[in-house]
Amino acid sequence: MRAGIKSILLILACAVLFGAGFRPRPLPAAAYAATGYSFAGALRAWKESLGPPLPEAVLLDVPVVYQWPEMPNGCEATALTMLLQYYGFAADKLSVAYDYIPRSDFTYTWFSTYGPDPASAYAGDPALFGFYCLAPAVAEGANRYLAEQDSTLRAVDISGADGYVLRRSIAQGRPVVVWATIGFEPLVYSDYSWRLYSDSSVYHPYKNLHCLIR
């Protein structure tokens, strides 16, 4: 395992992070007084409070794991497996998908299809007919795995984190798991839908969501 690293970062546009404390510090009130309340001076003081500037580019040696052919719909498990392997764990993508990340099959009735909220569990079967899961479910799966390995690392969902938070994590040697779209195209809703087990509300999934590691 990589020495000196206490947390793993998983992230999405929904986002997940192994560790916390990545928010930039707010600008101290004294900084405004010292600069005469000028915007340029306050901005300069705020940037200085963030620490050293981030590099333009960072290349991390993340292991490559292919989701195909076993899991055509298993990008979340594949991305998490790559992240765990980066930290020195002998993670297997099929085990991560079926033993650790929460998963729930669909139930079919005469009138409706019922399924999980992707925030809480993977919807369907990643090897067959499945959709996706979101950051909370992936973080839960990661923490199940880490606990079983007696690791001090923990995954934290940081959905909504801004670009600076993600870039700083990568610059510190911590890759992130993010949700994007296939080809980075605009989000598209699927024609398929189901009712949630939790409250019977109708859920319309995205058609082109994709999970990857950055």
Regions found by a protein language model. Name each.
Residues 125-164, 168-172:
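Mid-length scaffold segments of soluble, non-membrane domains
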Residues 80, 147, 183:
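Residue-level marker of positions within ordered structural domains that often coincide
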Residues 103, 149, 176-177:
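Short secondary-structure junctions and interdomain/linker hinges
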Residues 160-213:
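Active-site-adjacent substructure of cysteine-protease-like catalytic cores
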Residues 74-76, 154-156, 175-180:
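Structural recognition of the beta-strand scaffold that forms the well-ordered cores
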Residues 10, 80-84, 96, 138, ...:
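Generic hydrophobic secondary-structure signal
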